[in-house]
Amino acid sequence: MLAGADGYVRQEGVAEMAKRHKRRIFAGAVCTQIVYNVNEQADIKSSKPRKPRFATQAERDEFNSKISAGKFAALINANFGPTSLYSTLTLSAEFEAHTVEEIKRIRDNYWRRLTYRYPEAKIVMVYGRGKSTNRFHIHMISDGIPEDAIAKLWGLGSVVESKHLRKHNYYVNQNGEKVDHGQDYEALANYLHGHWQKEFGGHRYKASRTCTKPESEPATEAVREYSPEHPPVAPRGYVLVEARATQYGYQYYKYVFDPKRMKN
């Protein structure tokens, strides 16, 4: 007996629908929903997608990286929007960091200066190396810190850019069409998440305690047969922007909030 990516259990040429659960997660203006197979004894209160089996360590690492990137994108979407600032901070030759320990110390000292003066601010920071220069730099997304204070409290080099997050973000879908995802900052989150290197060790990013967690709803039983061609109904006020069956055996759907739909 085998369960395919389409969710059907096949035995001796007969196909029947496997038991499935679905779960929605709300993060800012984005709602994601997964539909996944479970065994007949699965407790709906604690169910989650089965972790796939991997042929190699590389496959396992890729899967874990995708899960980590998805959680990071949800964190960004849950806490930041058009009032937030995205800043890139570089170090002058005088203060240049040469080791991971040095850039961590610089990041943490700057973090303390910001949080001391703006304790209610939301902050996420990552550090990385420039592709051409190999020099350390810091990226930050913040909400509740004036733009001039970011540069004033940095003082170790330049603020290359400090700009507000976009109200409209466009992504290319599977048909090559540009789709307005609104305040969905997954692309920015993936860019920042990709700065981490194995030599850095530890966590990929640092987030302030003021950041809120995405809201995960309890799982419910999927009583209908869903597919990317026949997705679950969008939450009120949301529009479907992405639908796909993953290589890991579950379906993934993304919806973004559209204020115009609330007027209907």
Mark where each language-model region is.
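Calcium-binding loop positions in Ca2+-binding modules
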Residues: 137
